[in-house]
Amino acid sequence: MQKQVVVMDEAAIKRALTRVSYEIIERNKGTKNLALVGIKTRGIYLAERLHKRILEIEGIDVPVGDIDITLYRDDLSFKDDKTREPAVHGTNIPFDINGKKVVLVDDVLYTGRTVRAAMDALMDVGRPAQIHLAVLADRGHRELPIRADYVGKNIPTSGNERVEVRLTDVDHAEDAVIINKNE
């Protein structure tokens, strides 16, 4: 049986993203040379929300892009197991990242493997001056030496728990961060 516990509701997510937006601005001393890149899928929507808040706070339209890490993963998934053709969705970074302070955005930080793949993919696009990481939820259990620079909420979990982020933009359900516990 699976038990679900809501650890962040819509209001908590909004507050966390507002705080993270201020932290990004403060740490980067404004928005000069700043860019946001969301990791598909939910990272894209979170990057857009951070973009909107930074625009409201600073009045500056920071460039936003998204990155597909499919070909960079060490657990490559395939759209067809027979042909072993990877399910690639495409990267959309409509600006030059060279010399930019890029904030990679994702929903949950777990082992660090997704972030490693995203950094590899980003470096194939260009050479940013800095790469920072913003996540809505950090659940621990790292397998690689990667940490988030901006965290919405630290959510300690056990090995049999899973953290799920639901966003209205993609899931057609109310915004929430949920821990699914196997009992």
From Swiss-Prot:
It catalyses: UMP + diphosphate = 5-phospho-alpha-D-ribose 1-diphosphate + uracil. Its EC number is 2.4.2.9. Keywords: Glycosyltransferase, RNA-binding, Transcription, Transcription regulation, Transcription termination, Transferase. The keyword RNA-binding applies. Disulfide bonds: none annotated. InterPro entries: PRibTrfase_dom, PRTase-like, PyrR, PyrR_bifunctional. It comes from the Bacteria. It holds the Pfam family Pribosyltran. A motif (PRPP-binding) lies at residues 102-114. Gene3D superfamilies: 3.40.50.2020. GO terms for molecular function: RNA binding; uracil phosphoribosyltransferase activity. One of its GO terms (biological process) is DNA-templated transcription termination. Substrate binds at T41, R42, D106, D107, V108, L109, Y110, T111, G112, R113, T114, R139, V163. Homodimer and homohexamer; in equilibrium. Belongs to the purine/pyrimidine phosphoribosyltransferase family. PyrR subfamily. Regulates transcriptional attenuation of the pyrimidine nucleotide (pyr) operon by binding in a uridine-dependent manner to specific sites on pyr mRNA. This disrupts an antiterminator hairpin in the RNA and favors formation of a downstream transcription terminator, leading to a reduced expression of downstream genes. This is Bifunctional protein PyrR.
